[in-house]
């Protein structure tokens, strides 16, 4: 999982990427390609 300060560019890496908020942190998840995971912070 990548940790970045801005998720805007990581959201555009794949069309199936989606942004979710869990436990106060923002994540990018992709159910089809698991390697496109990222966390903001």
UniProtKB/Swiss-Prot annotation:
GO terms for cellular component: ribonucleoprotein complex; ribosome. It holds the Pfam family Ribosomal_L36. Keywords: Ribonucleoprotein, Ribosomal protein. One of its GO terms (biological process) is translation. It comes from the Bacteria. Transmembrane segments: none annotated. GO terms for molecular function: structural constituent of ribosome. Belongs to the bacterial ribosomal protein bL36 family. This is Large ribosomal subunit protein bL36.
């Amino acid at each position: 999982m990548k940790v970045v300060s801005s998720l805007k560019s990581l959201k555009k890496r794949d069309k199936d990427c989606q942004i979710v908020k869990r436990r106060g942190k923002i994540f990018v998840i992709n159910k089809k390609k698991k390697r496109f995971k990222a966390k903001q912070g």
